[in-house]
């Protein structure tokens, strides 16, 4: 996962971890764990919501969530 790219997109949209966590309906701690790949991953539905919130292209989604 490319957490730097996700964080930069969040910043461009003025979102904090709390803003995105609230939008996804998860706790801020859960979001941090997912971003830091600390034992949990983003679910497909969460990725879809992030794509919609930030108007991401399919390539951007691939770069953020599926990059090694």
What is the predicted role of each segment?
Residues 1-16, 23:
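A short, Lys/Arg-rich alpha-helix, primarily the initiator
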Residues 7, 32-33, 62:
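Key DNA-contacting residues within the recognition helix of helix-turn-helix
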Residues 19-21, 50:
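Short alpha-helical "recognition helix" segments of helix-turn-helix
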Residues 26-41:
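Recognition helix of helix-turn-helix/homeodomain-like DNA-binding domains
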């Amino acid at each position: 996962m490319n957490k730097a790219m996700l964080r930069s997109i969040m910043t461009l949209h003025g979102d904090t971890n709390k803003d995105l966590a609230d939008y996804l309906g998860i706790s801020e701690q859960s979001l941090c764990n997912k971003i830091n790949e600390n034992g949990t991953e983003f679910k497909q539905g969460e990725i879809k919501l992030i794509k919609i919130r930030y108007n991401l292209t399919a390539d951007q989604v691939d770069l953020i969530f599926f990059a090694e």
